[in-house]
């Protein structure tokens, strides 16, 4: 049988997941607004809820990477999509994300531009539910993403398959996988805003409030850049014993 050629307008979506049965259906419904064929790969880290069934009902592929680790899950999902040789564009999203209503037509216009595949693309971030402190944080993140070329994983990442492969793809890190990847990407190309806002669940900002959590995250990033083990930092971030990460 001849190898299937990649569809230039097919979108290959990779979603790392761990016990997201409550939020995953909303994102999967949003993704159905893509006006062309779409391939959805949910990479699970060992969920014990209904994430598998939900993914199957939405027509997505469900693969398992255990023990969980977002970098490992993202890398596995991308590799799976590339091996299928269907979509030329890869879109990485977190399972608790929500896409705006007209995201499909907006992204389609973007990738049809002749120069689009030269760049990597990210969404602006909206944290739900909204508070004044979170609005301020969103503004800081928008500036950081544009000026420093360092969007967070919560903002999603869209890039052509050829650019992903040239960059080396996601590293199998338990933490900081998003920053490590965009740092390598920024050495090859510019990361550009899509001009759309993606919503993320604000649960991670509830513990200690926005300021405290932002300072904790900044300290973790500083220690990572200084060379500390991502596994040790992940254990601290997720509140798990170092040996289980």
PLM feature spans:
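Acidic helix N-cap motif at the loop->helix transition within catalytic regions
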Residues: 22-26, 49-58, 102
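A conserved acidic beta->alpha catalytic loop
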Residues: 44-52, 97-98
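A recurrent flexible, glycine/aromatic-enriched loop bordering the glycosyltransferase active site
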Residues: 120-134, 141-159
């Amino acid at each position: 049988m001849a190898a299937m050629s990649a569809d230039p307008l097919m979108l290959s979506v990779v979603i790392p997941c761990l016990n997201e049965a409550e939020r995953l259906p909303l994102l999967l419904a949003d993704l159905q607004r893509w006006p062309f064929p779409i391939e959805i790969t949910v990479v699970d880290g060992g969920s014990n809820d209904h994430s598998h069934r939900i993914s199957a009902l939405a027509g997505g592929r469900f693969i398992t990477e255990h023990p969980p680790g977002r970098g490992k899950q993202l890398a596995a999902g991308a590799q799976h999509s590339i091996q299928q040789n269907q979509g030329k564009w890869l879109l990485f999203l977190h399972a608790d994300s929500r896409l705006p209503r007209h995201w499909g037509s907006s992204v389609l216009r973007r990738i049809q531009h002749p120069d689009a595949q030269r760049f990597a693309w990210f969404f602006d971030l909206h944290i739900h539910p909204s508070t004044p402190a979170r609005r301020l944080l969103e503004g800081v993140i928008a500036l950081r993403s544009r000026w420093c070329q360092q969007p967070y994983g919560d903002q999603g990442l869209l890039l052509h398959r050829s650019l992903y492969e040239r960059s080396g793809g996601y590293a199998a890190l338990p933490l900081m996988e998003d920053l490590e990847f965009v740092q390598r990407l920024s050495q090859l190309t510019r990361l550009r805003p899509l001009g759309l806002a993606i919503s993320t669940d604000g649960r991670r900002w509830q513990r200690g409030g926005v300021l405290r959590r932002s300072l904790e995250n900044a300290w973790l990033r500083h220690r990572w850049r200084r060379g500390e083990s991502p596994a040790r930092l992940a254990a601290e971030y997720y509140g798990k014993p170092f040996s289980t990460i």
